[in-house]
Amino acid sequence: MEKRKLEVLAPAGSFESLKAAVSAGADAVYMGGSKFGARAYAQNPEGEILLDAIDYAHLYGVKLYLTVNTLLKDQELEQELYEYLKPCYEHGLDAVLVQDLGVLCAIRKWFPALPVHASTQMTICGPGSVELLKEMGVERAVLSRELSLKEIADIYQKTGMELETFVHGALCYCYSGQCLFSSILGGRSGNRGRCAQPCRLAYQAVDAQKKALTGEQTLLSPKDICALDLIPQIAEAGVYSLKIEGRMKRPEYTAGVVRIYRKYVDQYLQNGAKGYQVAEADRKELLLLFNRDGFSRGYYEQHNGRNMMALENAKASDQEKRAYEALIEKLHAEYVETERKVPVRGQFRAVPEEPMQLTLSCRVDGQICQVEVTGEVPQQAQNRPMEEAQFLKQMKKLGGTPFTWEQLDLCLEGTLFVPVGALNNLRRTGLEALQKALVERYWREQPKAKEPEEAVSLKKAAPGTQKLHVSVETKEQLQAVLDFTEERTGQLHALYLEAETFEAELQELVPELQKKASETGNWKVYVLLPAVFRLHTKKRYEEKLQMWKSLPADGYVIRNPEEYVFLKDAGCEKEILLDHNVYTFNKRSRQKWTKRGVLWQTNPLELNARELREISYEYSIQVVYGRYPMMVTAGCVHKTLNQCKKKPEQWFLRDRYRKEFPVKNYCLDCYNMIYNSQPLYLLDRKVEVETLGAGACRMMFTTEKGKEPRELLERWITGTPWNGEFTRGHFKRGVE
C-alpha cells in the first residue's frame, strides 16, 4: 500500500508544553483556550498569550488546533463564541475541534475558511456519521477510541475522510461524549470539560444477589494506550493524524512521547512496514514517563478484556523514581529549556556607495520564505579595512532568536568600514522581518461581521397538554405498562421498546402492541435502537434489513447519528426521534435536526429548569423519571473479572459510600451500560415540568421490577412524592 504523509499530533496544556512539543518534532499541536475546551483544568493560555501560541507554532511550520470540544448553551454560543474565535481566526488558527452540532453550524457560517475537526466527543463510530459530518463541512473526524483497525479501514474506504485516532495516553472507560458519571456525582461534566475522573476510583463488583464478587478494585480504569508497535497498521487502515493524549501532563512528558513517536513515524515513512520494529529502550522510556499498570494497545486489535484494565497499578520503586527524575531532567534540558531553531540561509552584500543589503530565506513546512532588508551605506576605510571575518562575526550572532545559520554568504567589494552597531541593526532588522513574514503568511483578513441570527419562533406546549412517553428494557416492565394502559385508557402516548431486549420477537410483538394500542388509547410504538451502532451491529441489522423495513412500528428512537444514516439509507420514512444523548444543548443543534425531519427530540440530561425552559418546545421530550445512563462502555465488567457467560444480566458497582450503580451487559453488541445508583424523580414536580413547554414527558424504566413500573406510572397521574431514594438530577443545579 502506498505510504501517505502522517501527522504526529501533540497535546499542549500550556505554552511551555507547546514549546516542548514543537522542539520534539510535532507536526501539529492541539490546545484549549480560556473557554469551551474539554480540559478546563489545564493551564490553557488566554487572550494575547493564545495568539502568541498560534504564532509560535507557525514560526516552525507546526499547525495549531484549538479545542472547542464541549457542549455550549445558547448564551455561550450566541454571545461569546464569535468574539472568542475571531482573533484566533485572524491569526491563522489551523482548525477548531468541536463536539456540539450547533457550534459546528455556527463556525461554518461565521468563519467559512476555518477548517473544522469533529472531536472524539461526537462518538464517531462508523462511515454514516462521518459522511453526515462531511456534508456539514467537517474536514477531519477524530474517531472513537474503541474502534478496531477493521472498522477504521471501513470508514476510510467508504468516506475518504481525513481521520485522526489516539495512539498514546489515557483511555476513558466510557465512549467519549457519552459519560455522565462525573456530572451526576459531583456536577463536574465531562461534556463541559470538567471531568473529575470517578472512573479511576475503586469499586466492588456485586452480583444480582448483592454478593460481592471482588474487593475494591479500579474496575473502570483502563491502562494507557501505547500503539507505537501498530503505526504501520494504523497508517495503512487510513489514519492520517496520530494523536497523543496528555494536555494535563507536564511539558517533559509531552516532549518525551513526541520524540519517540516522531522517530518511529519517520522510520515508517522512510522504510515502510518491512523491518519496522520498536526498540525495547524506547518502550521502557515511555513506560517510565507514565503508565497505569503497564500499557495496552487499546482497542485496535481487541474489543475488550481484562488485560486492558489497570487493576493493580503498583507504586514505583525507588530505582524507578530515580530513573524517572533523571529522564525528566534530561528532557527538560533538551526540549523545554532549549528551543527549536529554524535553519536560515543568508546573503550579505556590502559595496561602496550603496546601502548594505541582507537577504534571508528559510524553508518551513515545505515553503520558502524570503525577506530583504537594507542598512546604512558603508564608509570608505581610512586606515585598516574590515576583514571578512569581522563581518561574519557580527552577522552570525543569533542569540535570543529562533534561528540558526544553515549558510551565510558574503559579497564584499572595496575597502570598507561599517560600525558594529550598523551591522547589528541590519542583522536584527532582517531576522525580525523574517520572523514576521513566517508568522504573518498564516494571518487572515477580518471575517465578515456577525449577522444577527434570524429569530425562530418555536411554539411551546401549553401546561397540561404533555403527552406521556415510556421506555422499557424488560418484558416485565412491558407487561406493567400494558396493564396500566388497560386501566388508564388514553394516558399513554408512546411506548419505546429497547431493540436488543426484544429484537428476536419484534416481528410478532409490534403488531400485537399496535392492536393493543388501538384498544387502549391509540398510543404509538417505537423501537429504541442500541446505544452504539458499530460495524458488527450494522451487519446484524443489514442481515435483517427486510424485517426492519417491514416492521409496523411507528418509528425509531436513535441514540447516535450512525443510526439516522442507516435508517435513511434503508429507505425508512417513519418517524425518527432523538434520545437525550444525541445532544441538543442549544437551538442551533435542535434546528439542525429539525431540518432533517427529526421533530421529536429528547432534552439533554445536564440542563437545569431555566435552561430547559429556553430550548423546550412542542416537540421536546422531557425525562421526568429514570436512572441516568452514566456510562456506555465497550469494556465489560464481566470480562474484566473473567466471568463472561455471553448472557445478559445485571450486576452492580459499589463505591466507597456503599452506593450501588446497576451495570447491564448487552451481549449482542458486547457493551455495558452503567446506571446511576438513584433514579431521577420529577413526578411530584409535574406542574413545574409542564411550564417548560415540552410536548412530552418520558419515564425511562431500566432496572424496575414487579409492581414498581405500575406504581410509578400512577404517581405520574397523581403527581405524588416518593419515599424511596431518588435524585433531582440537574433539574435544579445544572452544570458549570
Where do the model's predicted regions map?
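A cross-family signal for key residues in well-ordered alpha-helices
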Residues: C105
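Conserved phosphate-binding/catalytic loop of the ribokinase/pfkB sugar-kinase fold
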Residues: M122-G126
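Conserved non-cysteine loop/helix-boundary elements of the Radical SAM core domain that shape
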Residues: Q43-N44
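Surface-exposed amphipathic alpha-helical tracts and adjacent flexible/coil segments at the periphery
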Residues: M1-A24, A28-R39, I54, Y60-V68, ...
